[in-house]
Structures are given as structure tokens and as C-alpha cells.
Amino acid sequence: MSCKEHKVVHEAHNVEARKTPDHFYRSQPGPSYVQDIEQYRTMYQQSIEDPDAFFGEKAREFLHWEKDFTHVRAGSLRTGDTAWFLNGELNAAYNCVDRHALENPDKVAIIYEADDEADNRVVTFGELLRQVSQVAGVLQSWGVKKGDTVAVYMPMIPEAVVAMLAVARLGAVHSVIFAGFSSGSLRDRIVDAESKVVITCDEGRRGGKTVHTKKIVDEGLAGVGVVSHILVFQRTGSEGIPMKAGRDFWWHEEVRKQRGYLPPVSVNAEDPIFLLYTSGSTGSPKGVVHTTGGYLLGAALTTRYVFDIHPEDVLFTAGDVGWITGHTYALYGPLCLGTATIIFESTPAYPDYGRYWRIIQRHKATHFYVAPTAMRLIKTVGEQEISKYDLSSLRVLGSVGEPIAPDLWEWYNEKVGNNNCVVCDTMWQTESGSHLIAPLAGAIPTKPGSATVPFFGINACIIDPVTGDELEGNDVEGVLAIKSPWPSMARSVWNNHDRYIETYLKPYPGYYFTGDGAGRDHDGYYWIRGRVDDVVNVSGHRLSTAEIEAALSEHEGVSQAAVVGIADELTGQAVVAFVSLKEGYGRGSSTDTDPESIAPDVVPLDTLRRELVLQVRAEIGPFAAPKSVIVVDDLPKTRSGKIMRRTLRKISANEADQLGDLSTLANPETVPAIIAAVGAQFLKGKK
């Protein structure tokens, strides 16, 4: 597309809205909870114009309250004191376990897909109630009470879910720490949350490899006196696990001492249910605080309406409980609705790339929710496995974690869904608690690349980042913000409410700042651009880095691409592109980290750079062409698969000494190599 032809939200003009496939309706256990877009519009309008009536009714319909609330909401975004369901009392574990166990104790709650498929098992709601009660009894015997924080550092096993619900049963606050974090990162989070109890396991198993979980905990707690008790589940049963007398206790020994039922502790709707740490741009990670009533309702509503989940369905969320996706859509959402959830311990590549599809076939999963990163991996190296399995049970394919490119959306729909499923591209974040923008399966026509429409109560808007003014109408681009509170939004940052205000509410007073850029197309559909700081302004042209990355990725040799903006005296900002190459693309080790080792049959780096620049010029326009293209072995990513563009931006700006918190990186070894590559490339450019 040339500069003259560049349109606002131009992708929307290149795709057609997709109607719901007939297979979706034929395979439903019952009618859709929202029948069509007109019903959505009616419900959405009520949720915005009369949120007290809408959410008051939904809260009483979806949740069990020990004490009814007196007021639906109070406070505002401007003052940062939002509250929902005032004076109401409830318990999250009761809502997710007890009420379903009382109705049908033999119904399956958890389907466990272990690293080794021979270890698979299921947990019924009756069994889950007993296990949660027993672990809660252990914690109670150690003095854990309402408001205390308990750290959970476990792999994706049913006992991680049991631990979280046991903490919630006591009205305490769980702080789940991803089991891939280092001992130092674990220590920082335990100390910040002041967790006196840690729940962990002896070892973990992932991708056929052993993770020394308890050893990492011991290293993290060396010299830290805040923790008084550690509960250790025997995942592998390996001998020689060090246990500190008086502090460390075996799960199986302690639960034997407890009764099979412990009454839940009712808490106020605004009492915290959990805190979850996210990476900050500088300094230490921030513990985002979610509250019981609002969060639980958001989880239940979005699971029901976005995915059109029925009690008979099986939801396979391929996300870890160490992240918000696992919290909301592997645990609280499905279990609150009494729906079976698949807990997956392994990786999509172990023991082979057919693992996801065997899981779906074996358990007749109806819903599959996964990050685009995993689908890109399978598209590249494991696509041939898909056709070997019967995936006809699927009705809904979800995408989470980052915007899904239209071509990957199409591939996902065709190869995994056989064009029979609804593809739900969901936009949300740790701080939102549940979906912000997403199609309602069966009701909203979808568009490849678009997250579509706001969920109920999400008063979404587009703000001009320069003027701060709200942009009215359609065909607009800017910053995505929310202009009224919603139940599941985070209330604060643990022990640092000022940081919460500064990060989310101060940038645009009266609005919640998502940090994402977005466009609203001619149909009112939203297209997510990624983080606002991932928008580059070159000579007055606001360019989405995702758009440039998509153009780079169309080159036959590019495996992954990431684009950042750096200051430029002439154009204001300039585009810097980082690319890694596909295996076997005539590269040997010919990256910018090792530019001299080019084999005779490879494409020279300078030639490749020119091709990539021309690719972007042809796809978008001359104004979008990268000023520098840097070839690296790999890009820095979080453990949830997101590329850390902030890190690339800092390195490109010669601020490698200001990288901030890197604890969420899955591959920290990439950073020194990228620093060297950037230095070599920029020095070369000055010669």
C-alpha cells in the first residue's frame, strides 16, 4: 500500500466479516446465551447506561452470596477508589467448588494432562471439595487467616488449583508465582507480598525435563526470615529432597490429619482474592490486586458469554496459572460455572507436536484457548500433525496474549478449526481481570485480526495521545482507554496505591489507560496495535510496529520480527527492526552477532537487509522503511511468549544500563548478544 492509499484502520477494508459456522450451532449442548448482535447491543447498552441494574442482576444470577450486597458500585476512575457489590459477602471456593459438589459430586472438575501422558488423571467436584478443605485445614492450623498472603510456586498440576482454592477458602490472598521464575525473582515476590507460607512441590516435569522446584524455593528463601511454613507436594517422589525441620512439611502427611470438609470463610466483596505480579518498566515487579466479588463475576461472565460455555463443555486453556490467563480461564471462570477445565503441565512439542491435538481428541474438548506464539510455532514446524487427529468436538478457538495477525487467524481457523469454529481474538490484561474486547461466540461476526467489540460494561474509547481528547465516531486511531469502572478491574498495586494511580489512572484523568494503541474501524470493531510505546511516529506518520513486523515476516527467510522506534534528528523517530531467520535459511551463524562466519551459499547480510527494507516499502510505504535491520539468533521473550520490545528499545537507544526488570524473560541470554549486535551495526553505520 502506498502512502497516498494509506487508510485509517486500513486492514478492516481488506477482510470480510465472518458469520458463525453452522457446525457451531449444531454441536451446541443448548442455545447460545447471546443469540445475535442485536441482543448483544441491547445488553451492552444496558450495561453502560445502567450498570447498577445490569451487574446487580448478573451478580445475583452467577454468584452465591452469603450476604447480599447493599449497593452495586461506588467510587470513580478519577479518584481511584472504585468498589463493587458493597457490603456483600461470599467465598470464591464455595462458588467454584462447593455448590457444584453438592449438586453433582461425580461431575469432572479438572482433567489433568501430565507431562508424561501415562500420569493423566481427573478430579471430580466431590474430590476437589475434599482436597481443598484438607489443604485449607493445614493452612488454618498454621495460623493462616483472612487477609494473609500465601505464595504458590507450583507447576501446572491439579494441586496448584487445589492450593489456590484452599487459600481462597480461608479468605486469604494467594500470590501465585510462575514456577519457571528464578530463586531471586521468587524471593522478591515473597518478600514484597510478605507471604509467611509457601506451597510448592519437590520437583516439576516439563517437556521431559526435571525442574528442581523445591531447591529453587530453598535458594530463594536463604537469608529470608519472613516464611514460617512450606507445604511440599510430592510430584515426582524423588529421594533426597532437603526438608528443613519445623518449616518444611509434606503435603500428603499433613492432609491426612485434616477432616474432609472445612466450612468456607465469607469475605467482603472488596476483600482481595489474589495478587499477581507483572513486570514493570522500571524497578521491581508490581503486585496487581484483584478483589473477590468483582473479579469472580468478571471471570464467570466472560467465560459464559465470550466462549458461550455450557456446563457440559470442556475448556482447554493452554496457559499456566502463574499468569492471569490461567487464573481466569483455567480456574476461576470454568469452575465457577461448573465446567470441566483441562490443566496442562507440558509443552506443545512434547513428546511431539501432536500433543495439543491428542488432548482435544482424547477429552473431546469443545474450546481451545492458546497464545498466537504457540500457533506460530506449530505452523512453522508441526502443522502436519494436526490432520492426524479428530478435532470435530471443537466449537470455539480462542487467542490470547497478543494481537493475532490476520494470516495466522486464517491458518488457525482453517487448519485447527476446519472452518467450523468461531475464532475469538480476546484483548485483555492482568489488570483487567477478564476480557475487555472480544467477540461473543455465536452472536458477533468476526474479522481476522480484530478483537471486535467491547464486553458488557467496558466503555471503550479511543484517545488522541497528543491532545488527550477522546476521538468520536469510527475510522479513528489512537490510545485505547476505558471511561468507566468495571467489576473485575484491579483495585490497586500491593502496598503501593500511588503506583496504581500513576500507571493506569493519571495519564488520562477520568479514564483507565490500557497502555495499548487501537483503531476503531468503519463497523465499530476494535483493532489492537500493541503497546502504545510500540507505535512509531516517523515524519508525522503513526506506524504500528505490528504492521511493520507483519511485512517483515512475509519475507521467506524471516522467522520472527520485532520493531521499535528510536529518536531521529530528521524524522522524529526512526524504525529499527530486529529479525531472526528460519532454520536452514542459508545463514549458518551469519547474524549480526557473528557477521564474519558467512558460508559461501548464504545470502549476505547486507543483501538481506536491503530485501527487508524493500519489503516494508512495498507493503506499507517508504515512510515505514526501517533505518536499521539487525539480525539476531533469537528475540527476548517473556515466559508467556511475548517479545520484550521495551528491552529492544532501551538497547537501541543506548540505554542498556536502564533495562529495568528482566525477571519475566524466558531467554535472558539473548540480551548480551543483542547489545553486541546493536553496537556492531551502529558502529558500522558510522564508518
From Swiss-Prot:
One of its GO terms (biological process) is acetyl-CoA biosynthetic process from acetate. CoA binds at R206, G207, G208, K209, T325, S539, R617. Its EC number is 6.2.1.1. Gene3D superfamilies: 3.30.300.30, N-terminal domain of ligase-like. It catalyses: acetate + ATP + CoA = acetyl-CoA + AMP + diphosphate. Pfam families: ACAS_N, AMP-binding, AMP-binding_C. Coiled coil: none annotated. PROSITE patterns: AMP_BINDING. Keywords: ATP-binding, Ligase, Nucleotide-binding. It comes from the Eukaryota. One of its GO terms (molecular function) is ATP binding. One of its GO terms (cellular component) is nucleolus. It is an enzyme of class 6 (ligase). ATP binds at G401, E402, P403, D425, T426, M427, W428, Q429, T430, D516, R531, R542. Belongs to the ATP-dependent AMP-binding enzyme family. This is Acetyl-coenzyme A synthetase 2. It comes from Eremothecium gossypii (strain ATCC 10895 / CBS 109.51 / FGSC 9923 / NRRL Y-1056) (Yeast).
